[in-house]
Amino acid sequence: MGFFSEEFLSWLDQHADEIDKQSCQAGEQLIEKIAAEGAFRVGISESLGGSGVSDQDVIDILAELAQHSLTASFISWGQRTLIDNILHTDNSYFKETYLEKLLSGEYAGATALSNAVKYLSDLEELNVRILEENGQLYLKGRLPWVTNARRDQFLTIFVAGFPDDPSTSYVVAVPSDAENFSRSEDLEFVSLQGGNTAALTFNKVLLKEEWILSKDAHQFLAQNRPAFLGYQFGLAFGLAERSLSEVEKELGKRSVLTDEWKHQVEQLEAIRQELYRGLSDRSYFVTNPRELFQLRIDIVDVVAQSLLLELQAGGGRGYFSKSTSGFIRRWNEGAFLPIVSPSAVQLRHILATS
């Protein structure tokens, strides 16, 4: 028994290819439709407007979405990750002003922490700087790739640093109606086009004190990394599950693939159990991040092998442009997972050098 209503999943299946290939009205509606199902309230205490349960349930919901549309799952990951950061800041402003708006989908949550993840691993400089003029702080810079940044009413979270003090960086969240803050046209991708992905520019945006989630980005992000990375597994789990399900339907005619199918099913379940075991104690992956990084690398390989199996099981029919199998969409979606920040290559680099 899944979490989502049959009515919603039917709508999502009907629009999945359109959302994948186009910047469209269905894509604009997606966050609110997912929110209407109560998805973003899972894993949040009832006292804050949630429905309780755990991080595992959040991942299961993202996996269910990914079985139907990776775009839907990815923007939901961004939404839920931003919510998680708001829940773990000492700054009450965001809980009081934006939490319910994010839970209901009135506001979209654009998580733009990929630059920060690379920065904290000494792989990249911060894209947004904090400038001080006449006692005021301003944001100056550009985030080149941010998903779930709708045309209006979104909140974006990122890390900005002081150019003259590289050791100091802030985690900040800025609303889309901030003065001197602009959004580009949608970036053009081969897949996930309906995810409202754009570049965001800060042209001396006045940094208000209430927008600062933490003045110690290193510590804040390290504490919240298990959820940031852990929730991403939902995308991979769902895509692999759908692919392996499609393979299973063909095993009667393609029995030669049975052993390999069983192996991938076992690998998927082993990774899932290791992840859930680590997330059951929020501090475990904080102190053992290498284990989380390796699991993330491993799940990318499982998705790739599952998709290759699906191609072999389905044969040439999935390659026709008018095929209704959804395979080519899943194939393109699968190509996105190795490059989601932190990418598989970045994680390999961290493991090799630390």
Set out the residue ranges of the language-model regions:
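Amphipathic, small/basic residue-rich leader segments at the start of a protein or domain
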Residues: 1-76, 285, 354
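C-terminal helix-coil-helix/basic helical segment that borders enzyme active sites and/or dimer interfaces
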Residues: 16-22, 249-252, 269-304, 308-322
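A short, Trp-centered hydrophobic/proline-enriched beta-strand micro-motif
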Residues: 34, 40-42, 104-116
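N-terminal glycine-rich flavin-associated loop
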Residues: 70-92, 122
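A gly/ser-rich beta-alpha-beta helix-loop segment of oxidoreductase catalytic cores
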Residues: 108-131
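A short core secondary-structure module
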Residues: 145-181
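Glycine-rich beta->alpha junctions and the first turn(s) of the following alpha-helix
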Residues: 187-269
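Glycine-rich phosphate/cofactor-binding loops in nucleotide/flavin-utilizing enzymes
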Residues: 316-354
